[in-house]
């Protein structure tokens, strides 16, 4: 009886290094990788179609390094035991590129074929006039570089790999695929089990119509909305429910700009109600989403429990400078109150380091947000010229010095000089931002707002634990967090020494014990605070300025009293008066 040949495809989503040079890995990871899910789904479809021929089986292995150790020796043995195979480093961001390079070197030394794709490769090839040095180093190693999206293109790469003839570069940036009927993102249950909350991810669409200068997505996925169908989304959900997975992160950069959002939400609502499944979703939207009729209401009905909002800043000059023209500070409160009414937790992204920012102005603005905007949580980021963004291209063209260490391009490190702050002042302002917003007083305020509006105080407690704890305890951004930090003394940046076992392990266990105590102490205090709020007989009557319904408030709120805010409001009044004049003239 004839036995089929085998091709082993290993998909690896790399992590990156911490400040001490160790790979960031957890017993249970935080956010799931949509790139890994997409590539796995595409590879499964290639396997089903037997694109390598009737006599070749494709075996798949998916590894997210944030929660799974990459054992180069074991994987190499498995690939060489097969008739052919390769490693693909998928969804690699700029901060993950140094780690990816180190992984690639290990596999190439062992004669394994390697390819790499992701936002750093695609972004730099899209925006820079010459090849990025890090990408060129990959190519010099014999690593195949893939730019663009893999739908409809992966099979060609696999067909080249099976005969050992990978091309140095596969560039499909000018051939972005439609998404209707494409292979669906999926990850095996054993991989999802390593993600806290057993959450998986999928993209309902790609592309964003806006032009934010700090964003890389529009220069890789384009500004045209490309969408999956309602049938596709239902199939993704059913496929995951069959694995016992009910929690989803919809990774669209801006779900509100998906032109089919209503059809998708209607289908999710239909499936949810018909099957009686407790589906829950996390989405990302812009600050104008509340202007879409029924958008927020249908999101809540579909099971959206958390909403990430690109707030970015409350200074109109900063927003305009970043080409974030869609953000109107006069819409912020109305939008956030709408999510509050729908009982959906809001998490705002806030960027620190715009040209006019100073440590004092940053703290002032955060206090204004605390008092006047009913947002639940904020996550802070350094303004970073990410490779692939317009900001990076502009600085590159001007010859402005940027930090050469790509590992720092994680939005959690200073990578370029600031006009008003020294590096130390900027870093201090960043720490102050976290400490100011997540003061005990304000955490209690957020809990009271949640209780008064029928929200989930327990969820506020859990997320406050993350956002208040990760920086001081684990020294990583909350979005890179997980449960129980794992370290291997041999998984360190090559230019740093491997620490001796007698020093590494006692220190690791001591640090882990201290961290456990600090986490427990923080959790106990937050639990006490949550119980205090939930047991307050007056909790439903709580009211403050942020929860006050929106009326004509521009004379009263500090949010509108800065010079740039006044200029913005004057401009808005002129526009409204001009529009009224046109109506009267008709």
Model-identified regions with their sequence ranges:
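Structural recognition of alpha->loop->beta junctions
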Residues: 129-156, 298-306, 364-380
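Radical SAM [4Fe-4S] cluster-binding motif and immediate context
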Residues: 180-347, 352-354, 358-360, 364-367
């Amino acid at each position: 009886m004839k036995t089929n040949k085998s091709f082993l495809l290993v998909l690896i989503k790399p992590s990156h290094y911490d400040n001490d040079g160790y790979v960031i890995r957890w017993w249970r990871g935080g956010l799931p990788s949509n790139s890994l899910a997409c590539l796995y789904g595409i590879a499964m479809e290639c396997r089903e179609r037997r694109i390598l021929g009737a006599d070749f089986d494709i075996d798949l292995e998916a590894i997210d390094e944030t929660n799974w150790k990459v054992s180069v020796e074991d994987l190499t043995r498995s690939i060489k035991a097969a008739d052919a195979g390769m490693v693909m480093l998928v969804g690699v961001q700029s901060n993950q590129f140094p780690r990816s390079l180190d992984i690639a070197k290990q596999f190439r030394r062992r004669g394994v074929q390697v390819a790499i794709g992701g936002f750093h490769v695609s972004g730099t090839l899209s925006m820079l006039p010459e090849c990025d040095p890090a990408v060129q180093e990959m190519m010099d190693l014999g690593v195949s570089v893939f730019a663009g999206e893999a739908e409809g293109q992966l099979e060609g790469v696999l067909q080249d790999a099976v005969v050992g003839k990978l091309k140095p570069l596969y560039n499909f940036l000018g051939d972005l695929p439609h998404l209707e009927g494409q292979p669906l993102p999926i990850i095996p249950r054993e991989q999802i089990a390593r993600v806290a909350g057993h959450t998986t991810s999928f993209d309902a669409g790609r592309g964003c119509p806006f032009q934010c200068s700090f964003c890389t997505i529009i220069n890789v996925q384009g500004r045209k909305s490309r969408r999956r169908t309602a049938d596709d989304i239902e199939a993704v959900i059913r496929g995951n429910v069959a694995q016992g997975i009910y929690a989803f992160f919809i990774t669209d950069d801006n779900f509100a700009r998906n032109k089919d959002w209503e059809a998708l939400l209607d289908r999710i609502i239909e499936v949810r109600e018909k099957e009686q499944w407790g589906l829950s979703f996390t989405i990302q939207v812009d600050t104008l989403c509340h202007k879409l009729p029924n958008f927020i209401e249908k999101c809540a009905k579909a099971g959206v429990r958390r909403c990430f909002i690109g707030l970015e800043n409350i200074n109109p000059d900063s927003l305009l400078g970043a080409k974030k023209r869609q953000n109107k500070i006069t819409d912020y409160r109305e939008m956030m109150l709408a999510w509050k009414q729908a009982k959906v937790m809001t998490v705002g992204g806030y960027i620190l380091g715009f040209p006019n920012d100073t440590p004092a102005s940053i703290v002032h603005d955060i206090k204004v947000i605390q008092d006047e905007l009913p947002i639940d949580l904020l996550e802070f980021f350094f303004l970073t010229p990410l490779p692939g963004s317009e900001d990076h291209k502009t600085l590159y063209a001007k010859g402005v010095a940027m930090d050469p260490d790509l590992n720092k391009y994680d939005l959690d490190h200073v990578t370029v000089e600031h006009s008003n702050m020294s590096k130390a002042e900027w870093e201090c302002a960043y720490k102050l931002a976290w400490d100011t917003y997540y003061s005990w007083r304000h955490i209690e305020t957020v809990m009271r707002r949640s209780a008064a509006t029928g929200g989930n105080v327990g969820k506020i407690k859990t997320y406050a634990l993350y956002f208040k704890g990760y920086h001081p305890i684990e020294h990583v951004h909350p979005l890179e967090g997980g449960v129980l930090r794992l370290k291997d003394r041999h998984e360190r940046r090559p230019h740093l020494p491997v620490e001796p076992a007698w020093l590494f392990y006692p220190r690791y266990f001591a640090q882990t014990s201290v961290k456990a105590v600090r986490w427990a102490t923080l959790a106990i205090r937050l639990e006490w605070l949550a119980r205090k709020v939930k047991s307050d007989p007056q909790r439903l009557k709580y009211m403050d300025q942020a929860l006050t319904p929106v009326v004509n408030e521009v004379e009263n709120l500090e949010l509108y009293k800065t010079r740039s805010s006044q200029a913005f409001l004057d401009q808005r009044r002129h526009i409204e008066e001009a529009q009224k004049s046109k109506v009267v003239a008709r």
